[in-house]
């Protein structure tokens, strides 16, 4: 087994292996998903590829591989133990209607067991497959393929749908069984029924192969797909930890320099005490994640909504655990600098955005230290009376007062409560918070409803309208306008763009006029696949800071707009309806935001 493998070596071995199998390496995408309001961050390697898994042709072909940055916000409260991370890297390979189970499983087996690659002994690996249910049959095919490669039957486990099935991403769409690969850590079994997936820590999942062979229909039934796809994912940090024989991802080079920097400023040694170890791990993980979010080409800044709120929560939780370690004042720049130094070789955007990362961390840290001081003092005043309550429950209205008056996050109130043996009436808090939101919205702008990021006619129409808006803004405001991000639902579009000042009413009217003229002209929308360099030569607009493949799709809207884009789009602009700007406002420093609708 390759016990000395580094993270850099694992990345390069994986990519080189799949390139040798006819795959094309594509660039990892932004942590901030484009045109998908259903998630705040890119959560898996497959996320940016959903349109292609749904049937869109990919410019790079049918066999792809990449390294993708991912953030999973559902794990925030679990971070602090030895295994959970909010930011991680995912290695992936895909077949878009090309090979299927036989080749996919064979590739995984070869990469894992061949001495040229990872060299893991077969007797250290276990495999799970779908046991079948009323919707789809038992996946005997995958089990048979594993057996044909030399895996004994006692290492293959049939598990239910909740363990070995992926998708669909929405209510309907592509989905299918998966087969997961686990490595035995050598820990003792938790009992006679100990098996992969039992979460006792003996078996750790390192790779997952998803076989999209069904389509879930609106009535809940499943139909076989004509175009079958494969989507696989391997977690970098977890795999390296297992290969190196480390007890935790926090003992690998992904974290050693970050943890060392926290030890230096706190005077607390990692590994001496589980309570302080938990705080050190939280700081290391959260600062690492914050650096990658702030350093992303589509920079997200701390705020009270969406991805910005998650970022704010990560930073503030790290600050609080710094105080628990006895660190006074600002300190996040120290572990942040370690994160940048550790990762800037592969993720060059971290070094390029180092000043912004450190500046924003300090600004948020300053704000929160003041908030923390006031909020904790108020909580301490409340505590004696709260402890007298036999139910040990903090009323939701009191928790909301901390939030409303002091800006104290509910998550921190819950943490403080837990440390004192108390719980928060979250239902009551949520009710108070909802009333607060309703009052805040009264008399303000139209509330835009959310929606699934699908390829419905209306979502597709808004996507095309976004291209028209982008071009019109450049015509009215100047060529300095660059797209900084967008969010599209079936009800509206939101478009962020670089511009130093608010638009005048005249400018907004002119943008609307240009877009509506293009719509009225019923321009044809055409797509052409071409080399990226050729796209640049013909003046195709592209997303600022985005990484593109060598071959890209270019969508042309008559002679009005030419833009690099994955699609989909309408066939002609005449079907869009009347374009109307509803609001123009600041998104962040130097970035403006437009919300617009199509009216029929």
UniProtKB/Swiss-Prot annotation:
Which stretches are transmembrane?
none
The GO cellular component terms are: cytosol
The record's section on PROSITE patterns has: AA_TRNA_LIGASE_II_ALA
Q: Where along this sequence does the record place binding of Zn(2+)? A: 463, 467, 565, 569
Instruction: List GO molecular-function terms, semicolon-separated.
Output: alanine-tRNA ligase activity; aminoacyl-tRNA deacylase activity; ATP binding; tRNA binding; zinc ion binding
Superkingdom of this entry's organism?
Bacteria
GO BP terms: alanyl-tRNA aminoacylation
Instruction: Identify the main location.
Output: cytoplasm
Can you quote the record's cofactor note?
Answer: Binds 1 zinc ion per subunit.
Q: Does the keyword Transport apply?
A: no
Compartment list: Cytoplasm
Family matches, as InterPro entries: aa-tRNA-synth_II/BPL/LPL (IPR045864), Ala-tRNA-lgiase_IIc (IPR002318), Ala-tRNA-ligase_IIc_anticod-bd (IPR018162), Ala-tRNA-synth_IIc_core (IPR018165), Ala-tRNA-synth_IIc_N (IPR018164), Ala-tRNA_ligase (IPR050058), Ala_tRNA_ligase_euk/bac (IPR023033), Thr/Ala-tRNA-synth_IIc_edit (IPR018163)
Name the needed cofactors: Zn(2+)
Reaction catalysed by this enzyme: tRNA(Ala) + L-alanine + ATP = L-alanyl-tRNA(Ala) + AMP + diphosphate
Write the Enzyme Commission number(s) for this entry: 6.1.1.7
Q: Which UniProt keywords apply?
A: Aminoacyl-tRNA synthetase, ATP-binding, Cytoplasm, Ligase, Metal-binding, Nucleotide-binding, Protein biosynthesis, RNA-binding, tRNA-binding, Zinc
Free-text domain note: Consists of two domains; the N-terminal catalytic domain (in this organism this is shorter than usual) and the editing domain; the C-terminal C-Ala domain found in most orthologs is missing. The editing domain removes incorrectly charged amino acids.
Q: Which PANTHER family match?
A: ALANINE--TRNA LIGASE, CYTOPLASMIC (PTHR11777:SF9), ALANYL-TRNA SYNTHETASE (PTHR11777)
- What is this protein's function per UniProt? Catalyzes the attachment of alanine to tRNA(Ala) in a two-step reaction: alanine is first activated by ATP to form Ala-AMP and then transferred to the acceptor end of tRNA(Ala). Also edits incorrectly charged Ser-tRNA(Ala) and Gly-tRNA(Ala) via its editing domain.
Family, per the entry?
A: Belongs to the class-II aminoacyl-tRNA synthetase family.
Q: What name goes with this protein?
A: Alanine--tRNA ligase
What species does this protein belong to? Answer: Treponema denticola (strain ATCC 35405 / DSM 14222 / CIP 103919 / JCM 8153 / KCTC 15104)
Q: Which gene encodes it?
A: alaS
């Amino acid at each position: 087994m390759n016990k000395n493998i580094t993270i850099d070596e694992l990345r390069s071995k994986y990519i080189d292996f799949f390139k040798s199998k006819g795959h094309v390496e594509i660039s990892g995408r932004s942590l901030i998903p484009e045109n998908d309001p259903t998630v705040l961050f890119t959560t898996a390697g497959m996320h940016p590829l959903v349109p292609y898994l749904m049937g869109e042709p990919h410019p790079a072909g049918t066999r792809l591989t990449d390294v993708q940055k991912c953030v999973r916000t559902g794990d925030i409260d679990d971070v602090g133990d030895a295994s959970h991370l909010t930011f991680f890297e995912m290695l992936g390979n895909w077949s878009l209607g090309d090979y299927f189970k036989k080749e996919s499983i064979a590739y995984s087996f070869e990469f894992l067991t061949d001495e040229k690659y990872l060299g893991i002994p077969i007797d250290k690996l276990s495999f799970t497959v779908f046991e079948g249910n009323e919707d789809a049959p038992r996946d005997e095919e995958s089990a048979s393929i594993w057996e044909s490669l030399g895996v004994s039957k006692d290492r293959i486990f049939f598990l239910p749908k909740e363990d070995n099935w992926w998708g669909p991403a929405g209510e309907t769409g592509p989905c299918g069984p998966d087969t997961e690969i686990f490595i035995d850590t050598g820990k003792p079994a938790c009992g006679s029924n100990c098996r992969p997936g039992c979460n006792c820590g003996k078996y750790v999942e390192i790779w997952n192969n998803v076989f999209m062979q069904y389509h879930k229909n609106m009535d809940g039934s499943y139909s076989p797909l004509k175009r079958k796809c494969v989507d696989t994912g391997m977690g970098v940090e977890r795999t390296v930890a297992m290969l190196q024989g480390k007890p935790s991802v926090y003992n690998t080079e992904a974290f050693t320099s970050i943890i060392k920097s926290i030890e230096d400023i706190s005077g607390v040694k990692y590994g001496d005490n589980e309570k302080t170890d938990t705080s050190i791990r939280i700081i290391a993980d959260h600062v690492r994640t914050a650096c990658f979010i702030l350093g992303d080409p589509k920079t997200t800044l701390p705020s009270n909504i969406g991805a910005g709120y998650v970022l704010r929560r990560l930073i503030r939780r790290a600050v609080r655990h710094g105080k628990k370690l006895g660190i006074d004042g600002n300190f996040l720049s120290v572990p942040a600098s370690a994160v940048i130094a550790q990762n800037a070789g592969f993720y060059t955007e971290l070094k390029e955005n180092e000043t912004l990362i450190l500046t924003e961390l300090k600004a948020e840290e300053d704000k929160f230290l003041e908030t923390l001081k006031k909020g904790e003092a108020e909580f301490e005043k409340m505590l004696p009376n709260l402890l007298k309550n036999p139910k040990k429950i903090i009323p939701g209205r009191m928790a909301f007062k901390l939030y409303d008056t002091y800006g104290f996050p509910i998550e921190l109130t819950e943490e403080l409560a837990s440390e004192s043996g108390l719980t928060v009436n979250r239902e009551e808090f949520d009710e108070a918070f909802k009333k607060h939101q309703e009052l805040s919205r009264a008399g303000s702008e139209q509330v835009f409803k959310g929606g699934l990021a699908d390829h419905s006619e209306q979502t597709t129409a808004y996507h095309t309208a976004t291209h028209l808006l982008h071009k019109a803004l450049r015509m009215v405001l100047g060529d300095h306008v660059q797209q900084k991000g967008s969010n599209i639902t079936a009800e509206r579009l939101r478009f962020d763009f670089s511009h130093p000042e608010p638009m005048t009413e005249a400018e907004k009217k002119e943008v609307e006029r240009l877009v509506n003229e293009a719509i009225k002209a019923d321009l044809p929308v055409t797509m052409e696949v071409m080399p990226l360099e050729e796209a640049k030569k013909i003046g195709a607009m592209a997303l600022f800071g985005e990484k593109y493949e060598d071959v890209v799709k270019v969508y042309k809207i008559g002679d009005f707009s030419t833009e690099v884009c994955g699609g989909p789009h309408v066939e002609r602009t005449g079907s869009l309806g009347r374009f109307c700007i509803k609001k123009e406002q600041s998104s962040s420093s130097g970035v403006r935001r437009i919300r617009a609708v199509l009216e029929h």
